[in-house]
Amino acid sequence: MAENHKLWGGRFEASLEKWVEEFGASISFDQKMAEFDLKGSIAHVTMLGETGIIAQEEALQIKQGLEELLEEYKAGKLEFDVSNEDIHMNIESLLTAKIGPVAGKLHTARSRNDQVATDMHLYLKAKLVEVIEKIDNLRNTLVSLADKHTYTIMPGYTHLQHAQPISFGHHLMAYYNMFTRDSERFEFNIKHTDISPLGAAALAGTTFPIDRNMTSDLMGFAKPYSNSLDAVSDRDFILEFLSNSSILMMHMTRICEEIINWCSNEFKFVTLSDTFSTGSSIMPQKKNPDMAELIRGKSGRVYGNLIGLLTVMKSLPLAYNKDLQEDKEGMFDTVETITVAIDILAGMLNTMTVNDKHMAESTEKDFSNATELADYLATKGLPFREAHEIVGKLVLECTKAGYYLQDVPLERYQEVSDLIEEDIYETLKSHTAVERRHSLGGTGFDQVKWQIKEAQQSLNK
């Protein structure tokens, strides 16, 4: 009978079949947490020495070995073995090879259950800071572009139909606000991630006189978990990250969809930089917005990662279960997906050319000024519903005749209502329509300038 050399092998008389071992191994992906596993172990062994649970000289020897492994990892020199299952056992094996049997004391008062939870908290906390920095760069890009295009007029849409003329800067600031809320959600996510599970052990804590506050402080956490079962068994901080990432991706797909439309021949509102476009293998003229399409497409994998972990966690009894091995790949994949996608979107926006003249002209070949005429009549005392009816009939008349509201003769306007005077033509201009919308948060130029100023002050804090 084959001898079992696993670190947990004392209980077993036979070894795992190789193909079964490969099925249960996680080192192929959880090695991404190697740096954080080493840092957590350094904090743990420091505490073991300080509290006298192990001798100080042993703690220092183990700590030095871990620090050497950390340097080797950063230099790309560590090699991991699938037979050691996961990152924790790989590092313990490497440490044993480096400093000998004393390495076995590292795991005193610790379980892989609190160890892996600690690794994930450390990993995600670091990545959340990175994600927020990238979102803030995207927000800066949007504010700069909005400031440049405060006075650029474009059609505002509902149902993808021309609705009312708006400032392009106003349109961009809408996305700025969405991404600001995304950033705030990730900030709040840090609060729920900035908690140390270390010391919870397998599920019930430990009989050793550990100092959880010390390890929490050494790792830079705000505090330790107050319940050991909760510490090792829940992954809501990851679910929160995946949920926040899904909302972020949804927002990015919306602006990407608009960019895809805007650079088409049907719109011609923007031209993407060659550095963010691709061509066709058969059609020489093509310049495709592939990066925007990829961001739109990659939303599916991020949504899938959220649903995947929700399904893993559904009905899972306390405390640790092997199901929780499935909590990592979706998290890693989402981190990698959104960090690149944010940078790609910011780069596209920063380098695209805006055809502001064509944007403005497109508002002159539609009926997006119809609300201006209805409001004009309402300000002169006509009930808005009557004004709406009158303007609707005029639009129908113009549509049949092949011209627009600004082309209607004054005589015809005055046949419709004696409230209409010559100033109607100034009112119907797109620039006037935008400029007059002074209500708080509206598209009026003064309001857009105010939004931009508020955003700049927020970003500079």
Swiss-Prot record:
Q: What is its EC number?
A: 4.3.2.1
Q: Does the keyword Phosphoprotein apply?
A: no
One term under GO cellular component: cytosol
PROSITE patterns to which the protein is assigned, alphabetical? FUMARATE_LYASES
Q: Main site of residence?
A: cytoplasm
Q: Which reaction does it catalyse?
A: 2-(N(omega)-L-arginino)succinate = fumarate + L-arginine
Which cellular compartments is it found in? Cytoplasm
Q: What is its pathway?
A: Amino-acid biosynthesis; L-arginine biosynthesis; L-arginine from L-ornithine and carbamoyl phosphate: step 3/3
Q: Name one GO molecular function term.
A: argininosuccinate lyase activity
Alphabetically ordered keywords of this record? Amino-acid biosynthesis, Arginine biosynthesis, Cytoplasm, Lyase
Q: Which GO terms describe its biological process?
A: arginine biosynthetic process via ornithine; L-arginine biosynthetic process
Under NCBIfam families, the record lists:
argH
Membership in a protein family:
Belongs to the lyase 1 family. Argininosuccinate lyase subfamily.
Xref: HAMAP family: Arg_succ_lyase
Q: What name goes with this protein?
A: Argininosuccinate lyase
